Structures are given as structure tokens and as C-alpha cells.
Amino acid sequence: MDITNIKIKKPLLLVETDKNIVKGNYNNFSAKIIKTAEDSNYKIGDIIYTDANPFVPFVLDGVTFENIYQINETTIKGEIV
């Protein structure tokens, strides 16, 4: 299933991680942004970090995408430059 044509609204971001996030507390967990709202302060390809707890698995039409999560921009702690 392709997510390139879906539209999302600020403050939602879609991010990709290199591993599945399980319950627990990860400090400064990083992820790459793969989809933003048009008016987002972030851009595709930015690497951000935050605690893993705000990451919610991305589900579309009943399909859960592996290693893709939705996150609210307001929970981001910083950007890795």
C-alpha cells in the first residue's frame, strides 16, 4: 500500500524508524520524517528525536505499516542536523 498520495494535517507527521517500537520508555528515540502536512515546520527527510511514547503505529484501511508511526509535531524534542 502506497502512502505517498495521502494527505495529512498539521500537527501530524509520519515518521519511519529502523526498528519497531514496543511499550517502554526510550529517551531521545530518533526517526526520519517521511510525510508532512503542507504547512508543517518540518520537511521530508528531517531526522527528529523525542521519547518513543508519543509514537502511534500508522494504520490505513486496516493495514498496520511496519516501522511507520504517526507523531504530533508538538511532542518533538529536537532535530538532528
Regions found by a protein language model. Name each.
Residues 1-81:
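Compact, glycine-rich, soluble single-domain proteins
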